[in-house]
């Protein structure tokens, strides 16, 4: 296998403790990159770092906390060298009707997925300018078309896409490339938890056949890492998602038609309810953002 352009370069991955972030870390380690793994779950991060065949640094940091990110960046530079690739992967979700959602939980999704991505970019942009590096914003299928019962997540991922497009145009002349990743449904704890709620499971399974398929985190990560090696401006996982860009303006009427048909049926028995933070990552974020004194 030819030597990867990522070999011996320092790569930062946020949200690295589990799911797609963990899969990205393992795929990047296969390219012999030095890895800085950021997230909330210290034990999981440390275990992941210890299992990798490359230098790896596990750091607990909240992507919405500018001071924590600056401290992490200083430690990364001191122990692994200046980062030349940053993957803004940290993300959380909560589902259910907007009208009865918890305003604090709703806003937290925006803060982590959008503001946290921007704060990550702000922290490491000097390094990327110095190294003519690459920033990958992990967006989502939800960036291409919003769905009901996921208003905060869809808004945050649409915002993250727009932020990355803007940043892409701002820093290109400085030698920094910015890419946007559009993963479809990925087999993570977040998705498994969401599928336990009848309304969310049925809304997903009523999507067209290709769009409702859940893909393995390893397969998605492999595709994203190939895009990082090539400094792509966009990467779709799976590849057919690129075609959705052409028809994305037609998606809202389709979603509206399906929702008008399905939501009354789903709401006729047990009323639709908020899910709270989805998955172990969501619960870890809530615990870190609102610690309870012993």
PLM region descriptions:
Residues 31-47:
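Conserved glycine-rich Rossmann-like NAD(P)H-binding loop of the short-chain dehydrogenase/reductase
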Residues 61-71, 103:
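The beta1-alpha1 cofactor-binding region of Rossmann-like NAD(H)/NADP(H)-dependent oxidoreductases
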Residues 173-239:
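SDR active-site lid
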Residues 140:
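Residue(s) in the substrate-gating loop at a strand-loop-helix junction
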Residues 10, 15-18:
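Conserved glycine-rich cofactor-binding loop
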Residues 97-98, 102-110:
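Substrate-binding pocket helix/loop in short-chain dehydrogenase/reductase
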């Amino acid at each position: 296998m030819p030597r990867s352009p990522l070999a011996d370069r320092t790569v930062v991955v946020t949200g690295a403790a589990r799911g797609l972030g963990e899969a990205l870390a393992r795929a990047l380690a296969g390219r012999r990159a030095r890895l800085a793994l950021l997230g909330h779950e210290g034990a999981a991060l440390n275990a992941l770092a210890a299992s990798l065949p490359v230098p790896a640094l596990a750091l607990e940091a909240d992507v919405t906390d500018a001071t924590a990110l600056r401290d992490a960046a200083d430690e990364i530079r001191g122990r692994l060298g200046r980062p030349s690739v940053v993957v803004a992967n940290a993300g959380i979700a909560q589902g259910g009707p907007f009208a009865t959602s918890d305003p604090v939980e709703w806003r937290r999704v925006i803060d982590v997925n959008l503001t946290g991505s921007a704060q990550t970019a702000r922290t490491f942009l000097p390094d990327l300018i110095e190294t003519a590096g690459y920033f990958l914003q992990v967006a989502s299928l939800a960036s291409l078309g919003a769905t009901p019962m996921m208003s905060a997540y869809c808004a945050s991922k649409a915002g993250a896409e727009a932020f990355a497009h803007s940043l892409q145009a701002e820093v290109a002349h400085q030698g920094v490339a910015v890419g946007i990743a559009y993963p479809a449904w990925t087999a993570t704890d977040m998705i498994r938890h969401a599928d336990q709620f009848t309304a969310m499971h049925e809304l997903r399974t009523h999507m067209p056949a290709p769009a409702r398929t859940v893909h393995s985190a390893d397969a998605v990560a492999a595709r994203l890492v190939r895009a990082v090696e090539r400094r792509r401006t966009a990467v779709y996982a799976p590849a057919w998602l690129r075609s959705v860009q052409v028809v994305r303006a037609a998606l809202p009427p389709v979603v509206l038609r399906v929702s008008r048909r399905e939501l009354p049926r789903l709401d006729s028995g047990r009323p639709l309810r908020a899910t709270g933070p989805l998955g172990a990552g969501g619960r870890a974020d809530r615990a870190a953002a609102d610690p309870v004194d012993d």
